[in-house]
Amino acid sequence: MADTLKPEAPNPDTDAYAHESELDAHLQTKRMVINMGPSHPATHGTVRLKVELEGETIVKIDPEIGFLHRGFQKSCENVTWTQCLPYTDRLNYLSAMMNNFGFLNAVEKLIGLEIPERAQYIRVIGSELHRLTDHLTCVGATGLEMGGFAPFLLAMEFRELLHDRTAELTGARLTTSFGRVGGSNRDLPEGWIPRVHKTLDQGLALLDEMEGLLTNNRIFVDRTKGTGVISAEDAIEYGYTGPALRACGVDYDIRKTKPYWVYDRFDFDIPVGEHGDNYDRYLVRLEEMRQSIRILRQAMDTIPAGPIIVDDWRIALPPKPEVYGTIEGVMSHFKLVMEGIQVPAGEVYDATEASNGELGWYLVSDGRGRPYKVHVRAPGFPVLAAVPHIIEGKMLADLIPTFDTINMIGGEVEQ
């Protein structure tokens, strides 16, 4: 009889001490749900993290995306192949040239087109400039969000110098829309290479100073070493690429494993971590910046003379004297602008090594001047998908450095 009359939940007035665990389970008094985002300075984009806590331990975390969705893939179906470029800028807006060149490379592969050698060098130079700016933002923000304001200022000072050089090359600091199918729309400005060499000299000094403030800093090391750990096997299962995968000990970089453009002509190393934690991800990015500087110096010192775009009026705009002086030139110009490049029917997948990993493009053409389908495999989505696996059961304080070092960019994740 006593058992049948016993209430389902303990009476908090009389049984709190005797049945504390049952009471907690019934009333959920020890757990709290907080929101990180969708507008939060540490999320690197408008993403919401719904975090369930027990004390300061993360019991469950649920990433919610969609706040930055712009309909990228559908938008590309309504414009010409060239007009897709401004949309690609806004995927990873910290390294827009990598998006531009990756898309153009896939279109050229679909056409079966090889671009001039000088244009390939220009693409390598632009890509490595933006790899530097992306990594500087990631490393600087990681230090800032753990209390290190000086490293952030050093990173931003170097990044500003790089933005100045980028603006001289492309006409824009961030969203560049640089390059065209068949090569480049601009050549390197006169006197630009010596200015970049000087910028890299200044940047190396800033990089050394930033490393001195972070790498052996006890607070930074305690917050990053042994936190945010993911094994190489799990990273591969989730689809990790780029610095996050290499920090786990996997030596995979498309520039080495499947070289494109002229990367196979340069002497550079691929930094690989060991433990797959936040500290290794920081170290990998730090060393990648030094390797990018090596590549830039070699590319600028050995860039050949020659054309920067193919001499084919079906692909590239005719020279202005031909447009103004010949009927063939003006007709080719008009058809290319109004109808777009007529890409042969077919499909292709092509990938380049972007700052955060493999940036893959799956393109389908039906033979017209507009894409039938554009799908982008962004490196940020797999690293975000693995956040619950990495962080559940860990401390709330570990979430910020983990989210910083995986460097999820909302623009490429949500498209």
From Swiss-Prot:
GO CC, one annotated term: plasma membrane
Primary subcellular site in the record, as a coarse category: membrane
Cell inner membrane in keyword set: yes
EC number(s) reported in the record: 7.1.1.-
Localization (cell): Cell inner membrane
Keyword NAD appears in the UniProt entry: yes
Alphabetized GO MF terms: NAD binding; NADH:ubiquinone reductase (non-electrogenic) activity; quinone binding
SUPFAM superfamilies: HydB/Nqo4-like
Keywords from the UniProt entry: Cell inner membrane, Cell membrane, Membrane, NAD, Quinone, Translocase, Transport, Ubiquinone
Signal peptide: none
Reaction equation(s) it catalyzes: a quinone + NADH + 5 H(+)(in) = a quinol + NAD(+) + 4 H(+)(out)
Membrane topology term: Peripheral membrane protein
NCBIfam families per record: NuoD (TIGR01962), PRK06075.1 (NF004739)
Protein family per UniProt: Belongs to the complex I 49 kDa subunit family.
Subunit structure: NDH-1 is composed of 14 different subunits. Subunits NuoB, C, D, E, F, and G constitute the peripheral sector of the complex.
Function summary: NDH-1 shuttles electrons from NADH, via FMN and iron-sulfur (Fe-S) centers, to quinones in the respiratory chain. The immediate electron acceptor for the enzyme in this species is believed to be ubiquinone. Couples the redox reaction to proton translocation (for every two electrons transferred, four hydrogen ions are translocated across the cytoplasmic membrane), and thus conserves the redox energy in a proton gradient.
Protein name as catalogued: NADH-quinone oxidoreductase subunit D
